[in-house]
């Protein structure tokens, strides 16, 4: 069995240590069937092979200065599997309230339950400052996203082994929205530094990989979630400390009181409503015409536009994630109808990587779906992509079927059933025993 190790010369991940854990929930095969039903998941998402148990964990990781800080997360484990299992690390999307973090929603996590039942050991970091973690959440800060994820993988693997389970050395990374950014940050950190983790495949989905260009260009557009901009602003001020001396230098009156709403007790929808209320009542701008730029002091934005060394510009550039070469298979998934995270982020990442990487790299456009609707088809596609690489155990009760498996369905890369099969196109063949083959049909 391959052990997960890390190089002691790389200081960012020195503090990893699980300090407490709690068994939160278990699911029987019948419970998991109910999860499929309640979540409207198609059967081909994954065979229900195992019962599952899930733990909430607290662990030490590093803050932006490299100092130890407590974070929290969740671990889902398939029960009674008979050989070492692959690891799937899920990176969650934008969360403002502590109650929205994975460790606080274990019983409702279809991704964790379904993936573990198929045969993955699933890790989910809350990142810094969310769940029961310490400090302010550094939203879309690549360094601490990556360190929080990597430290949970390292220590989570040791924790899983302490329970008597084994992992097989395969590591799959996927995340959506902010989780796409965190996934890309984790790929970059692992493959650009001397960390002995080997990524089997990754699927960054709908992430803002170009914070300084593709995403920043949306400041002057009507935006479904205006609360994202202050979140980035406050996070980068927390990390770098030089974006402003007084919040009133950046945000117009009334908007400059928003910071208190990012204390972990409010949801993004509540913050959005407050922003739209201020815009309407104070500035006579309705929500259908409001842009993030309407919150920003004119002089601050003018300085940002004219100064190539402006602190906010440099902070955004520091968190761009298209300046490395992926060394493992990667599938970028996004939908061109996304008004929250510009599809141009995925295009820029693909164009930056494609000329140089020698690994499988695919950009999939899910069509004119919005940010929310794109999530399910993207996640299903990522899961099917991983299944073609994963080395699963053969569940005991399926052993008799293995020699007689038969094809039950064919799906495209977004998990949609194929009725008409176009030649020279990638498909997934799902068999009766839950195993998935990746094929190109030629005829």
Whereabouts are the PLM-identified features?
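Accessory cap/linker subdomain of secreted extracellular hydrolases
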Residues: 208-323
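C-terminal catalytic histidine-bearing segment of alpha/beta-hydrolase fold enzymes
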Residues: 216, 308, 313-314, 340, ...
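Residue-level detector of functionally pivotal "anchor" positions at catalytic/ligand-binding pockets or at interdomain
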Residues: 391-418, 442
């Amino acid at each position: 069995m391959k052990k997960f190790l890390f190089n002691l010369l790389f200081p960012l991940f020195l503090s990893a240590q699980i300090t407490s854990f709690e068994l939160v929930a278990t699911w029987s095969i019948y419970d998991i069937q109910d999860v499929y039903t309640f979540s409207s998941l198609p059967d081909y998402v994954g065979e229900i092979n195992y019962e599952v148990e899930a733990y909430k964990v607290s662990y030490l990781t590093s803050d932006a200065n490299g100092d130890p800080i407590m974070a929290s997360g969740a671990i889902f484990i398939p029960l009674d599997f008979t050989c070492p299992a692959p690891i799937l690390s899920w990176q969650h999307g934008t969360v403002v309230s502590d109650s929205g973090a994975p460790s606080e929603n274990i019983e409702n996590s279809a991704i964790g339950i379904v993936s573990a039942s198929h045969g993955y050991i699933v890790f989910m970091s809350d990142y810094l400052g969310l769940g029961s973690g310490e400090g302010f959440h550094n939203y879309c800060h690549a360094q601490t996203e990556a360190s929080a994820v990597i430290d949970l993988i390292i220590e989570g693997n040791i924790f899983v082994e302490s329970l008597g389970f084994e992992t097989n050395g395969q590591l799959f990374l996927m995340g959506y929205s902010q989780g796409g950014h965190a996934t890309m940050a984790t790929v970059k950190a692992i493959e650009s530094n001397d960390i002995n983790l080997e990524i089997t495949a990754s699927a960054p989905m709908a992430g803002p990989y170009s914070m300084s260009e593709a995403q920043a260009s949306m400041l002057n557009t009507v935006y479904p979630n205006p609360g994202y901009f202050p979140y980035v602003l406050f996070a980068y001020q927390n990390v770098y400390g030089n974006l402003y001396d007084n919040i009133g230098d950046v945000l117009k009156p009334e908007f400059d009181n928003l910071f208190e709403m990012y204390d972990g007790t409010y949801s993004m929808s509540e913050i959005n409503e407050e922003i739209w209320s201020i815009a309407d009542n104070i500035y006579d701008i309705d929500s259908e015409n409001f842009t993030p730029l309407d919150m920003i002091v004119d002089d601050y934005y003018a300085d940002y536009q004219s100064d190539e060394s402006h602190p906010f510009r440099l902070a955004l550039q520091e968190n761009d994630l298209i300046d490395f070469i992926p060394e493992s298979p990667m599938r970028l998934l996004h939908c061109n109808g996304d008004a929250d995270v510009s599809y141009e982020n995925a295009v820029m990442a693909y164009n930056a990587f494609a000329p140089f990487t020698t690994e499988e790299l695919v950009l999939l456009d899910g069509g004119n779906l919005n940010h929310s609707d794109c999530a399910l088809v993207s996640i299903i596609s990522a899961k099917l992509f991983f299944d073609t690489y994963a080395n699963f155990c053969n569940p005991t009760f399926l052993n008799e079927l293995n020699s007689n498996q038969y094809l039950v369905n064919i799906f495209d890369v977004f998990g949609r059933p194929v009725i008409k099969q176009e030649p020279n196109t990638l498909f997934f063949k799902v068999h009766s025993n839950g195993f998935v083959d990746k094929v190109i049909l030629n005829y």
